[in-house]
Amino acid sequence: MITGKLITVEGPDGAGKTTVLEQLIPLLKQKVAQEILTTREPGGVAISEYIRELILDINHTTMDPKTELLLYIAARRQHLVEKVLPALEAGQLVFIDRFIDSSVAYQGAGRGLIKADIQWLNEFATDGLEPDLTLYFDVPSEIGLARINANQQREVNRLDLETIEIHQRVRKGYLALAKEHPKRIVTIDATKPLKEVVSVALEHVLTLLLA
């Protein structure tokens, strides 16, 4: 039985969601006694991390969009049963850096795959599990890509080779999801100063936990 809460963190490349999460968790630990788990997709467990390497390998430029989607779905399933569900059943507060919405935005809006197919695969992999809250960090594609290019410590992966048009479609996909699920997905302006973005995210999380 699930007694914990699931919060997912989403955003286009360069939105800074991972950085926000790194700063958010220590602040949250000062305010709640609940045990907190942070993890990521694809990855989080050994099998899923191996799949992550396959997906991001810069040499795999011939990967078909459906192959890419199925790899993400496989990684999601293993991560869920091995790490996420046990934590939720133990009453923990679980944060996942990317989850089901990423597939709809990237492989759906970005790659042009049929949304209904992606939603079915998501439901198949998760047994219908949905986040209690999704923090969507929004940033224009031009700004996001500029941030990526300015980060010299970031290792280039296959997805960094995509055109700006694909990144723009991904963002539109996310914004459409936010309109479709207004109660679950909150949109946060990620162009604001980091401290302000973290503060807004913290407020939304605390609102969920205190409801």
UniProtKB/Swiss-Prot annotation:
Organism: Streptococcus pyogenes serotype M3 (strain ATCC BAA-595 / MGAS315)
NCBIfam families: DTMP_kinase
GO biological process: dTDP biosynthetic process; dTTP biosynthetic process; dUDP biosynthetic process
Record-linked PANTHER family: THYMIDYLATE KINASE, UMP-CMP KINASE 2, MITOCHONDRIAL
Catalytic reaction list: dTMP + ATP = dTDP + ADP
The name this protein goes by in its record: Thymidylate kinase
One GO CC annotation: cytosol
Positions annotated to bind ATP: 11-18
Enzyme Commission no: 2.7.4.9
Keywords of the record: ATP-binding, Kinase, Nucleotide biosynthesis, Nucleotide-binding, Transferase
The keyword NAD is assigned to this record: no
Group of enzyme by EC: transferase
Family according to the record: Belongs to the thymidylate kinase family.
Any one GO molecular-function label of the UniProt entry: ATP binding
Protein purpose: Phosphorylation of dTMP to form dTDP in both de novo and salvage pathways of dTTP synthesis.
